[in-house]
Amino acid sequence: MTNQKTNINNNIDVPEPSIIDKLIHEPSRLIIISHLYIMENADLIFFKRKTNLSWGNLSSHASKLENAGYIEIEKVFRGKKPVTVLKITEQGRKAFDKYKDIMMNVFQV
């Protein structure tokens, strides 16, 4: 069974919706992982500013990405202040590469 459908109007293969990684596709998590893909790591304060999410929602989205193995959440100290840092994993990088490829295919239709 293929993961693509043939579009009757122009015979272009359209990806099945089921192959889109819904964990990444959610807008808040997409913002988080796309920034980490470029930056590799950033603290929660950065993402709070970028997403305008509440601390609880931001933590929830980060935890979902961590549970999937896409990011690591680390507590570090900058000077004497504790900081929570998010870091993309190799698995997260591969998942985002796959997501980008699928979405590029969607937008080329």
Where are these regions (language model features)?
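N-terminal helix-turn-helix DNA-binding core of bacterial DNA-binding proteins
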Residues: 15-57, 76-79, 85
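Short beta-strand "wing" residues that participate in macromolecule-binding interfaces
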Residues: 73
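Basic, amphipathic "hinge/linker" alpha-helix immediately C-terminal to the N-terminal HTH DNA-binding motif
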Residues: 78-97
